[in-house]
């Protein structure tokens, strides 16, 4: 009897090709399209360029997913997780921005929606043995450690293990990643060869399941903005006014709107209580560098005691944003939920609220939220 795989069929090229490959491998395949955002229900008006369109991008995605399912002769189911997305992902996203932190909704979306709500629905309602996604990542079972390992994809430029760092053993044991050993070019080539409607569709960008938005306007739907001073961190001189401290991220250069300056300025720090945005000039970029950070809400994907000699302090690599090169670090345990991450060399623009993701070579160990940056 064939094993059944339910694929998160999003209407994009990656999940389309994932379906095709699983069929080629002999699985029984069905698609499941998720709708996780409703602009009307969620007051998504400001910054939404699609608000007056006859057909919203999500509905077009569903039509594309349906066309792919029809072409491959598989069933396509549809499910709404609009409330769950709001409760588990978007509420946290907004609360973090209120604190002038910079969260990563894609990581939460994977943890709570794609690999939790979706996974449970596929197994309990559709009788799936596995789920599959169009992510670029690998899962392998290590017979020595008896752990499911999340491993970087063959195409390092597309590797998405950073966004999967909050997953657990149970989720990995039920997940297939058919694109693990393919490049994006190979995926598009397969889609073209199979005449899939999504072959030349551009990759989705913007906020997970919400899409492209004018970000400043979008946040104004949910958080009142308050102007304040822009201050040179070196001289303490007021240089101008910011439009709301939450709209800026550490290391940002564009959009600060300081006119008449002899050189570009970068966002260096934020004082939430005083509503001050601190900036530094290009010649004072040392203010952007830090030597370590504190992280919390740690998630170890696997039993790290089987991978490092001392779980209280060990060397590994880390990424502090997507597509960043791996950095050598020492991870020191403070308590079960708090760790200090010490950098082998100072790193630029480490941002509170973002995710620190830890690796041993190509194996993703897990991730944690950056809570404090130490200069």
UniProtKB/Swiss-Prot annotation:
Keyword Acetylation among UniProt keywords: no
Site (Interaction with tRNA): 135, 354
GO MF term list: ATP binding; tRNA binding; tRNA-uridine 2-sulfurtransferase activity
Binding site for ATP: 8-15, 34, 134
E.C. code: 2.8.1.13
CDD domains membership: MnmA_TRMU-like
Main subcellular location of this protein, as a coarse class: cytoplasm
Region described as Interaction with tRNA: 158-160, 321-322
InterPro entries the record matches: MnmA-like, MnmA-like_C, MnmA-like_central, MnmA-like_central_sf, Rossmann-like_a/b/a_fold
Catalytic residues as annotated in Swiss-Prot or TrEMBL: 109, 208
Task of the protein: Catalyzes the 2-thiolation of uridine at the wobble position (U34) of tRNA, leading to the formation of s(2)U34.
Protein name: tRNA-specific 2-thiouridylase MnmA
Organism: Mycoplasma capricolum subsp. capricolum (strain California kid / ATCC 27343 / NCTC 10154)
């Amino acid at each position: 009897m064939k094993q059944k795989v339910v694929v998160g069929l999003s209407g994009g090229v990656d999940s389309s090709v994932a379906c095709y490959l699983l069929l080629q491998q002999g699985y029984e395949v069905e698609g499941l399209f998720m709708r996780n955002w409703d602009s009307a229900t969620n007051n998504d008006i400001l910054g939404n360029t699609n608000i007056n369109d006859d057909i919203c991008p999500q509905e077009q995605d569903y039509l594309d997913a349906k066309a792919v399912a029809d072409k491959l002769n598989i069933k396509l189911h549809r499910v709404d997780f609009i409330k769950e997305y709001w409760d588990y992902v978007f509420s946290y996203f907004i609360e973090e921005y209120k604190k002038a932190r910079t969260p990563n909704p894609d990581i939460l979306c994977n943890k709570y929606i794609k690999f939790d709500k979706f996974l449970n629905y596929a197994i309990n309602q559709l009788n799936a043995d596995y789920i599959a996604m169009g992510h670029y990542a690998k899962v392998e079972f290590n017979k020595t450690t008896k752990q499911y390992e999340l491993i970087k994809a063959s195409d390092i430029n597309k590797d998405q293990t950073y966004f999967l760092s909050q997953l657990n053993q149970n989720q990995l044991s039920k997940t297939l990643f058919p694109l693990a050993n393919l490049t994006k070019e190979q995926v598009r080539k397969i889609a073209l060869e199979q005449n899939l409607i999504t072959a030349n569709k551009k990759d989705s960008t913007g906020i997970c399941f919400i899409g492209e938005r004018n970000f400043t306007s979008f946040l104004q739907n949910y958080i009142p903005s308050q102007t304040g001073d822009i201050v040179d961190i070196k001289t303490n001189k007021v240089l101008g006014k910011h439009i709301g401290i939450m709209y800026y991220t550490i290391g940002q250069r564009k959009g600060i709107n300081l006119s008449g300056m002899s050189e570009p300025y970068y966002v260096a720090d934020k004082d939430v209580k005083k509503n001050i945005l601190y900036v530094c000039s290009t010649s004072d970029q040392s203010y952007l560098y830090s030597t370590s950070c504190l992280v919390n809400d740690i998630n170890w994907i696997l039993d790290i005691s089987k991978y490092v000699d001392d779980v209280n302090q060990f060397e590994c690599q880390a990424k502090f944003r997507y597509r960043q090169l791996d950095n050598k670090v020492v991870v020191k345990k403070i308590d079960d939920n708090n760790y200090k991450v010490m950098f082998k060399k100072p790193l630029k623009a480490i941002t509170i609220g973002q995710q620190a993701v830890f690796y041993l070579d190509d194996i993703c160990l897990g991730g944690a939220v950056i809570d404090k940056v130490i200069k």
